[in-house]
Amino acid sequence: MHECLTLNPISLVNGTINLPGSKSITNRALLLSAMSNSTTHLKNILYSQDTQYMLNTLKICGIKFNCSYTNLSCTIEGCNKPLNISHKTSLFLGNAGTAFRSLAAIFSLNNNNILLTGNKRMKQRPIKHLVQALQQGGAQITYSEQDQYPPIKIKGGFIGGNIFVSGKISSQFLSALLIATPLAQLDSTITVTEKLVSKPYIDITLNLISKFGIKIIHKDYTKFNVQGRQKYISPKEYSIEGDASSASYFLAAAAIKGGSVKVTGIGLNSIQGDVKFANVLKKMGAYITFGKDFIVCKKKDLIGIDLDMNDIPDAAMTIAIVALFSKGKTVIRNIYNWRVKETDRLSAMTNELKKIGAQVIEGNDYIEILPPINFVYAKINTYDDHRIAMCFALIALSGIKVTLLNYKCVNKTFPDYFQKLKSICSY
């Protein structure tokens, strides 16, 4: 039986949160550092389940690194080439999508004999579009269980060239190709077919790649020209900014029950798209101030909105919670890719929002929410999804208790989330 956690009603939130490092940036930075030409010192690294899977893989590949959990740092000796495992290997990557997709592309570059696998949910998350793109460049990849889904067997062979990849399901497929193609034998042209989702995550990838010495030219995110036979050049030191998706919970708490909450580690200079979450809160009526590396939110009366949130899919989940405390209807649009995340988030959010008294309409790629007349105590199923657990913790701001089942799923990206939340709460 999974453990549950009951949160008592919170009367006020006030204080400062120093954000943990971004998961998306940490895993990319670990991978690029490992393949770079010398030693890289990473600061403000995130230590969580998802990043541990990447570190475990680096260790198996023979990469030498020294991590300090107290200083949130990691020093990595680059191997100056794509990651490689000389013997037949099976790698278990849990439900770490960023790690799985990027490693699938990198292991396609060398002669390997690797089975990439994951947990039950990972085996339900489609990977066909990435596999097809890698196969176009010569990769030998086969499905070992269900067609179009992990686990996959990788035997190398990817040399680049003309690649077509769908942008419809996940931007991680394109990110993986952008990380791998500079190391391929041939120059590559990557053409994105179908509309690209979560575009800001591509900006994160391009930003990281440029910090490691590689520039990629693109035409409006539809065509990317990549020179092959390049090397990743270590920046010597790289500081990972705070996790903008994780910031959303604390900023939302302030908008609902502030006080004033300041999050540090992200701000005007952030490379993450999810900082735009603060602008959405502002549209809903919250008081927002941006600094270079901080954001402050204060409570004001909130109103519902109708908005396309394709660019901030993770933080958009938090807006679904803010909607419960807002006047009128909220519609979150263009979020089909919620369905292929850690769980089918559209279905899961609909089910759990209804439990606490909200009126909800679930569309194919949107969710419509009317706030409860009265909040109802509920036991929230978290679906082993860290973001659902973190979102629904905010129901305690309603004046009633809330119970979260399997609350430790937050370990995926934010192991001390509940302690951090408690640090700004008055009861």
From Swiss-Prot:
Catalytic activity, as annotated:
3-phosphoshikimate + phosphoenolpyruvate = 5-O-(1-carboxyvinyl)-3-phosphoshikimate + phosphate
EC number(s) recorded for this UniProt protein: 2.5.1.19
Instruction: Please identify the protein, giving its name as recorded.
Output: 3-phosphoshikimate 1-carboxyvinyltransferase
The task this protein performs is described as: Catalyzes the transfer of the enolpyruvyl moiety of phosphoenolpyruvate (PEP) to the 5-hydroxyl of shikimate-3-phosphate (S3P) to produce enolpyruvyl shikimate-3-phosphate and inorganic phosphate.
| Similarity-based family | Belongs to the EPSP synthase family.
List ligand-binding residues for 3-phosphoshikimate.
23-24, 28, 170-172, 198, 314, 337, 341
Extract the InterPro entries matched here: Enolpyruvate_Tfrase_dom, Enolpyruvate_Tfrase_sf, EPSP_synthase, EPSP_synthase_CS, RNA3'P_cycl/enolpyr_Trfase_a/b
Signal peptide: which range, if any?
none
Spell out the PANTHER family in the cross-references.
AROM/DEHYDROQUINATE SYNTHASE, PENTAFUNCTIONAL AROM POLYPEPTIDE
Broad enzyme group: transferase
Organism name: Buchnera aphidicola subsp. Baizongia pistaciae (strain Bp)
Q: Cite the annotated pathway.
A: Metabolic intermediate biosynthesis; chorismate biosynthesis; chorismate from D-erythrose 4-phosphate and phosphoenolpyruvate: step 6/7
